[in-house]
Amino acid sequence: MTEFRIVEAVALSPEETWRRVTDWPRHGEAVPFTVVTGDGRTVVGRTGIGRFGFADVMDVERWEPPQGSFGVGRCRLVKRGPVVTGWAEIEVRPYRGGSAVRWREELRIGVLPGLFDRPTAWCGRVVFRRALRTLLRG
């Protein structure tokens, strides 16, 4: 497994930042070739073209939206495969009149040996930083 972290600061309230970052269907607009659905307990990101692709199935293990302008919001998703396993943690907190998002993720692409952990982390940082910035732009 490989872990990566992303931190972004924005001039949005913690509540608005949380709303944008946890709007699961919008993640599909930010990640190429992906459609995301969710029912509040499970989030599924289907990535692919036509019949070729895979589903990243995630269970919402922790859901604590920020309460008020000074609250901290936390969400933990557990990826249960079959192709992608691991977890993602999202934290939103007040920061300099706006808010900061910390996205931490540990993942494993099932078919890849550990030799690919570093390139996977690099790709994860690039893809998720781009996705996070897109989500925060609204």
Feature-to-residue mapping (PLM):
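Hydrophobic-ligand binding "helix-grip"
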Residues: 29-38, 49-100, 106-109, 137
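A conserved amphipathic terminal alpha-helix motif
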Residues: 106-138
